[in-house]
């Protein structure tokens, strides 16, 4: 009996520690090539082996994807390869040939090598949570990399409510068929019509955890950065997005994707705004899509914590 109570107390203490644990999230108000390098260096994680920098290449020139000029210095400092996957809906990135033309139009290929991860096929990663998806389908080139910088543009999203590092790790790293598998909550890798919203969000969280776990193997690692600029209610996958109504906020980074996305959401929801600076459209987009649930479910899966310590590097 004493042994039982001792084990119980240890378990309760561990649960209490986990509930109170905080992850560090670094923050700068400056959005520049220099500040992007500075906030990455604040993480104190040194890359090893071949480095992937996961970005979104943007559906059109009207999309609000991160500019090559902004990311060039960081990517070149780590000798990184820009990585992306083809989309699941045709358009300018629906196959590798048109996607490479899009990449060239954006100028990404002028700053670093660019690898379309699913250009030669796809592989399956195991998932911890099989409620909806039973594996995560990603580009077959992913095992070529030892270190990933998940470099996301934080903004709204038509389906997920918002897009940050969790979406960039899940939908972003998924192959074309893998994207459909997540969107359909494990029903199909082909065209889907309608999915329960929470099932889709929970599938994203499970897929993000699969990618995180892959890069937490011995000899590998992953870090996360959100750039909070040009925050339209629409994703960079939209070729004709709404104009941003919210002013730029800065760059945030962490080794914990849950804490990072939560910190960005908190900045948006607590923002007072003013003339020409209106957070309400983005807040409405997040709320109507139940977007916060992705973060909540990712925490439930053990991917990270919503408790964070925001550290300014300015």
What are these regions (language model features)?
Residues 1-22:
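Bacterial Sec-dependent N-terminal signal peptides
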């Amino acid at each position: 009996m004493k042994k039982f109570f001792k084990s119980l107390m240890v378990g309760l203490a561990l649960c209490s520690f986990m509930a109170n644990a905080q992850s560090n999230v670094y923050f700068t108000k400056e959005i520049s090539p220099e500040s992007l390098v500075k906030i990455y260096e604040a993480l104190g994680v040194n890359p090893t082996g071949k480095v992937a920098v996961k970005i979104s290449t943007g559906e059109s020139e009207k999309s609000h994807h991160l500019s090559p000029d902004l990311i060039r210095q960081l990517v070149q400092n780590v000798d990184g390869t820009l990585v992306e996957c083809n989309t699941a809906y045709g358009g300018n990135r629906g196959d590798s040939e048109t996607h490479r033309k899009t990449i060239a139009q954006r100028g990404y290929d002028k700053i670093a090598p660019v690898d379309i991860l699913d250009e030669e096929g796809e592989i399956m990663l195991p998932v911890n949570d099989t409620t909806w998806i039973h594996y995560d389908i990603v580009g077959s080139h992913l095992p070529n990399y030892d270190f990933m910088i998940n470099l996301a543009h934080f903004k709204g999203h038509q389906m997920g409510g918002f897009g940050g590092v969790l979406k960039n790790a899940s939908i972003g790293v998924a192959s074309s068929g893998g994207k459909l598998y997540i969107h359909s909550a494990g029903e199909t890798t082909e065209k889907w019509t309608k999915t329960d919203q929470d099932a889709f969000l929970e599938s994203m969280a499970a897929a993000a955890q699969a990618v995180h776990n892959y890069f937490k193997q011995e000899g590998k690692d992953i870090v996360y950065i959100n750039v909070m600029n040009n925050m339209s209610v629409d994703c960079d996958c939209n070729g004709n997005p709404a104009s941003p109504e919210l002013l730029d906020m800065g760059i945030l980074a962490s080794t914990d994707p849950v804490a990072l996305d939560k910190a960005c959401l908190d900045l948006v929801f607590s923002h007072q705004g003013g003339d020409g600076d209106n957070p309400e459209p983005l807040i409405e987009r997040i709320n109507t899509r139940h977007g916060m649930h992705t973060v909540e479910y990712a925490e439930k899966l053990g991917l990270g914590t919503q408790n964070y310590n925001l550290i300014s590097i300015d």
